[in-house]
Amino acid sequence: MTMLLVSVLADLDLLVSNLLALDQSSTTTGYAVFKNGKPVVISHFTVSGDLGDRLEKIRNKIIGLIKEHEIDEVVFEDIQLQDMAGGRDVGIKTFKILAEVFGVVHELMTELDMDYTIVPPIVWKATFKIAGKGRKVEKKLAQEYVLATYGINCTEDEADATCIGTHIIKKQGSEFNWS
């Protein structure tokens, strides 16, 4: 085997890690596990209880997924403040709760010394040309993408997680240096 081929194979091994993609929330989190660039699990989990209990359950579930699927890298969605409910503070309350969930996931990645990427929603949605179409339409288009691409009919949360993971894989592939 030539040195160039050995180098390419080593780079490919780095490219196709076991990836966990999350569309996290305080109650239902969609997730997708990718191995060798393909989704092998597309699912979600739901937690209940007060916010503190839910945060602990989310943390433990993510730890379980990382161990079960031998995850090398995690990608999760950044949060954004949205103008909701005619300008009332519903958006702010939701944002604060999502910030706590985000903080738990972010801290966990640091604690576990995991490779991770945080993707703003507008960035991964732009990859699929669904950004700026309104929440309802974006969710439906993400589901349609997953069905058309992977043949899997899934929930909105599962579709978003799958698209987030696919975005990272496409981005890694476009940045791969074949020389």
Residues covered by each model-derived region:
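Phosphate- and other anionic-substrate recognition elements at nucleic-acid/protein interfaces
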Residues: T2-S179
